A protein has these predicted regions:
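The feature captures the beta-strand-to-loop junction immediately N-terminal to the Walker
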Residues: 11-13
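Helix-to-loop junction immediately C-terminal to a conserved catalytic motif
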Residues: 26
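Conserved ABC ATPase "signature" region
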Residues: 42, 77, 84-102, 153-154
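Short coil-to-helix segment of the ABC ATPase nucleotide-binding domain corresponding to the Q-loop/switch region
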Residues: 66-75
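Conserved ABC ATPase signature
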Residues: 106-110, 114
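Conserved catalytic motifs of ABC-family nucleotide-binding domains
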Residues: 127
Length: 192
């Protein structure tokens, strides 16, 4: 059971199924057995776009000819949100992530750090119940990794968004997670 606003780490050796479970929750892979619930909703029967989830994976796609603002606003525009709500959410997310100054710049002109923050901002402007983060999203040099993990913790604490974070680093799992789900060979072996 995952409570609203929790920060959960999925921990285990490489290849044990952590990322696969994340992808199943996000609807990127079929749920092969069992049932996955979000609150009281059975996700197995809900289309991925209707799950109120956001994902932060290494292979995020940004539209390089759009500016940062338009990339972050895209999901809201596709859902026909009013302009004032789009403005408010994009600006709030940019402020939280420290990228307000780059909103008008084209993606192709941004640093990798800022591109990653735009991708994270795009994930949170839709106000998901849960943010799914694969460890590859934060994989980079130690200083950038620390900054990205701080951003994810701040999203969890400030916005009260539940975070499911995959890692095979035991220290990171203990440091970040309020609850740790241990996995081995595709199965949950312990929850602590």
């Amino acid at each position: 059971r995952v409570d609203n606003g929790e920060f959960i780490t999925l921990h285990g050796p490489s290849g044990c199924g952590k990322s696969t479970i994340l992808r199943m929750i996000g609807g990127l892979e079929d749920i092969t057995s069992g049932k996955i619930y979000l609150s009281d909703e059975l996700l197995n029967d809900i289309l991925p776009r209707d799950r109120r989830l956001a994902m932060a994976f290494q292979n995020y796609t940004l539209y390089k000819h759009f500016n940062a603002y338009d990339n972050m606003a895209l999901g809201l525009r596709l859902r026909d949100f009013p302009r004032n709500i789009i403005d408010s959410r994009v600006n709030d997310a940019a402020k939280l992530l420290g990228i307000s100054g780059v909103l008008g710049q084209k993606i192709k002109a941004l640093s990798e750090r800022d591109k990653q923050k735009v991708a994270l901002g795009r994930a949170i402007v839709c106000q998901p119940k849960v943010l799914l983060v694969d460890e590859d999203f934060a994989r980079q040099d130690p200083e950038r990794r620390k900054e990205m993990l701080c951003d994810i913790l701040e999203i969890n604490e400030e916005l009260k968004i539940t975070v499911l974070y995959v890692t095979n680093d035991p220290l990171e799992a203990r440091t970040l997670g309020k609850k740790i789900v241990f996995m081995k060979d595709g199965k949950i072996t312990d929850i602590g």
